[in-house]
């Protein structure tokens, strides 16, 4: 049998701020797929949503704090140095050129995956990476027709399949439901409410100390 490829997980997002709803599913994917490395990629200007409330350098700092004690995770800041929107397909092209024939696994939540046909050059994503879709057990809605066609062609039935080819598969990975949203955290911070245990303590402390997201300065 062929030796497994080096397998790198990629989790992009605004991380505005990063919280356990980002981190726990990614950790479960890391374990299930046996990722060699997990890269978190903060977006400078996301093309599909409103501009983040906090600047890119500050959000990247929070991500670094969130994974500082995780030897399997690191922060990839390449999108922060681009002018204009951060398109995932361009990031994957850069990574593929740098890393060669490793297995790249783009991690997406189920709701984000449903919107994939609205992304720039979305079919090219599968040429450059696998897509790992995190979902709650037993909860899967109808897929848009274009997406259903890709799933039928590309679905992987075992995580191990992703370690033996560099790109092209779609894996649905059940993860523990974590009902935390950045919107809810920002709202609580603006009202001066506690967000303890919703995000890593190092992240919470920095946000409170700096007064980001409108947290009251006492």
From Swiss-Prot:
One of its GO terms (molecular function) is nicotinate-nucleotide adenylyltransferase activity. Keywords: ATP-binding, NAD, Nucleotide-binding, Nucleotidyltransferase, Pyridine nucleotide biosynthesis, Transferase. It catalyses: nicotinate beta-D-ribonucleotide + ATP + H(+) = deamido-NAD(+) + diphosphate. One of its GO terms (biological process) is NAD biosynthetic process. CDD domains: NMNAT. It comes from the Bacteria. Pathway: Cofactor biosynthesis; NAD(+) biosynthesis; deamido-NAD(+) from nicotinate D-ribonucleotide: step 1/1. Catalyzes the reversible adenylation of nicotinate mononucleotide (NaMN) to nicotinic acid adenine dinucleotide (NaAD). This is Probable nicotinate-nucleotide adenylyltransferase.
């Amino acid at each position: 049998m062929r030796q497994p490829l080096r397998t790198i997980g990629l989790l992009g997002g605004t991380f505005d701020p990063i919280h356990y709803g980002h981190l726990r599913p990614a950790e479960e994917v890391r374990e299930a797929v046996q990722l060699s490395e997990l890269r978190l990629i903060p977006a400078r200007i996301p093309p599909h949503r409103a501009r983040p409330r906090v600047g890119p350098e500050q959000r990247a700092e929070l991500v670094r704090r969130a994974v500082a004690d995780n030897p399997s995770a690191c922060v990839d800041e390449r999108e922060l140095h681009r002018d204009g929107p951060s398109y995932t397909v361009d990031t994957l092209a850069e990574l593929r050129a740098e890393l060669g024939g490793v297995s790249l696994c783009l991690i997406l939540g189920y709701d984000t995956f449903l919107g994939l046909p609205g992304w720039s050059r979305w079919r090219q994503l599968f040429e450059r990476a696998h897509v790992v879709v995190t979902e709650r057990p037993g909860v899967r809605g109808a897929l848009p027709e274009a997406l259903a066609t890709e799933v039928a062609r590309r679905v992987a039935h075992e995580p191990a399949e992703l370690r033996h080819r560099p790109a092209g598969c779609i894996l649905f990975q059940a993860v523990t439901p974590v009902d935390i949203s950045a919107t809810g955290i920002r709202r609580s911070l603006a009202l001066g409410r506690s967000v303890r245990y919703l995000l890593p303590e190092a992240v919470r402390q920095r946000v409170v100390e700096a007064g980001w997201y409108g947290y009251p300065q006492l």
